[in-house]
């Protein structure tokens, strides 16, 4: 079986030839099917640039990114757009819900774009809503929902298309601690029960402790990685803090 994600010798430069900034420096790592991986690093470490390259929002300067064996750095135009729609699910810090659509319509939109039949759309939206405990908000508009509810709607939108990979960028960044915990429990459910493969960028150690593996980036390079294994979430949290201390920077920002 192909790995869900393979990043090989990735490099990304910004700026002109006279003043180049290297955001990613010869970075390589893999993500296995049904794995939940967190990416951590200080501000400016390259983690957001990495996610942008994987999501095809940005093109790498060099290197390759494979999703289930397909080199997405070679895709262009409509083929790239179709791949992004069908193979990726996105969860953003600021939800990215359309204010003029209900929760149901926001979730269904991802399937409508793929020309899925109405009966199938309804079935899949209802299932995703049940999985993420948001059936009671399906007829509500974003302004009528709490931040936690909006992020669970966004998560349902991400999972409803059954993507190969869910990409989450600071998904708890706009949530309070209770809403964050509820969302992360749903991430675990998506990963363990729905077999979703998740790659999550976060600065928050508590959020990262829900992952099965944490990859640490420093100055655009792979600094270290740790696996949860049989460790409890509390023990894994402690291991994450230990690595962040070695990584440098203000550990309090990650608490």
Please tell me what each predicted stretch does:
Residues 155, 183:
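Hydrophobic anchor residue at the start of the ABC signature
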Residues 63-71:
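Conserved ABC transporter NBD signature motif
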Residues 55:
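Helix-to-loop junction immediately C-terminal to a conserved catalytic motif
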Residues 101-109:
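Short coil-to-helix segment of the ABC ATPase nucleotide-binding domain corresponding to the Q-loop/switch region
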Residues 166-169:
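Catalytic Walker B motif of ABC-type/P-loop ATPase nucleotide-binding domains
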Residues 141-145, 149-151:
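Conserved ABC ATPase signature
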Residues 160-164:
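A short, proline-enriched helix->beta-strand linker immediately N-terminal to the Walker B motif
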